[in-house]
């Protein structure tokens, strides 16, 4: 690395970025998320050899929201063939808001990628077809990857999202009309919102996602999570589609595969080296953590890291 990693470096980056807090806006379209303290700021790094670095509010749990879309895709990859998955969802950036209906109708009910709502709902529909208890299975996967046995769903957030789910329900019904949604809409929506309502800390997220930096292998599990090729494919999707319609801007500023969520979290991957998780609840206009992106930008500059 250009700079040797330690907690002091991370603490200094948080100090540099903290003045940005107050310039973004906490997600308020989900009432249960609107009450989160917007001043929170944390970062954690887990290296492929198991070292952990952290600063700020790195151990406070928050709603991971769309970061869970990566995890649901991982579970689907373990139960479906490549052909079965990618005939129902694409691999291209959407360039549209994450909950867009217009593009979906124009493209005959086939979502652009699995990291927007449309694609994630198709993935959840697939999980409903192969798993007897999809929500429990997701908990088992996350607890296993993180090494933390008490990670759970925030049922208040899940309920709040379900009560304000008209647009996602419309997405599901539109895909059903095109033959690309096979199970009960309400059941799949409930699963989807529970996945989004997983509560995890930056430390737990970094430990969970380090397998994507380690060719598909978690650091404390013998069996590979995914194959090296699948890990590379997931990282590629994160690079092109992980930051909503601002993936290009993020690639320019940060240069790493990443996935964000409207809870203010972002997970980024340095292949062969580390997983990084940041959290700051205030969002920019695209729904990405405003200060979180700035933290990652400063970190990659100081470490001299980019996949480009």
From Swiss-Prot:
InterPro entries: Beta-lactam/transpept-like, Glutaminase. SUPFAM superfamilies: beta-lactamase/transpeptidase-like. It is an enzyme of class 3 (hydrolase). It holds the Pfam family Glutaminase. One of its GO terms (biological process) is glutamate biosynthetic process. HAMAP family: Glutaminase (MF_00313). Belongs to the glutaminase family. This is Glutaminase 2. It comes from Shigella flexneri.
């Amino acid at each position: 690395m250009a700079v040797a990693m330690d907690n002091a470096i991370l603490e200094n980056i948080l100090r540099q970025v903290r003045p940005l807090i107050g310039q973004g806006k906490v997600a308020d379209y989900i009432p249960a998320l609107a009450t989160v303290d917007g001043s929170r700021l944390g970062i954690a790094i887990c290296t492929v050899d198991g070292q952990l670095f952290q600063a700020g509010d790195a151990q406070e749990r928050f709603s991971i929201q769309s970061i869970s879309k990566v995890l649901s895709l991982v579970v689907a990859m373990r139960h479906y063939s490549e052909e079965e998955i990618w005939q129902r969802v694409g691999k291209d950036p959407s360039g549209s808001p994450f909950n867009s209906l217009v593009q979906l109708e124009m493209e005959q009910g086939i979502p652009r990628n699995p990291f927007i709502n449309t694609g994630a709902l198709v993935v959840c529909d697939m999980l409903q077809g192969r798993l007897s208890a999809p929500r429990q299975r997701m908990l088992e996967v996350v607890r296993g990857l993180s090494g933390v046995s008490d990670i759970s769903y925030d049922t208040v957030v899940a309920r709040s999202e379900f009560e304000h789910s008209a647009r996602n329900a419309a997405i599901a019904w539109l895909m059903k009309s095109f033959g690309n949604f096979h199970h009960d809409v309400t059941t799949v929506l409930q699963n989807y919102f529970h996945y989004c309502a997983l509560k995890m800390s930056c430390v737990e997220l970094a430990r969970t996602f380090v397998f994507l930096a380690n060719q598909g292998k978690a650091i404390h599990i013998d069996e590979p999570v995914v194959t090296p090729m699948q890990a590379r494919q997931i990282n590629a999707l994160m690079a092109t589609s992980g930051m909503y319609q601002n993936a290009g801007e993020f690639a320019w500023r940060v240069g790493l595969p990443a996935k964000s969520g409207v809870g203010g979290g972002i997970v980024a991957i340095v292949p062969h080296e580390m997983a990084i998780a940041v959290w700051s609840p205030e969002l920019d206009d695209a729904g990405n953590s405003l200060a979180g992106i700035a933290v990652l930008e400063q970190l990659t500059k100081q470490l001299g890291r980019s996949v480009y």
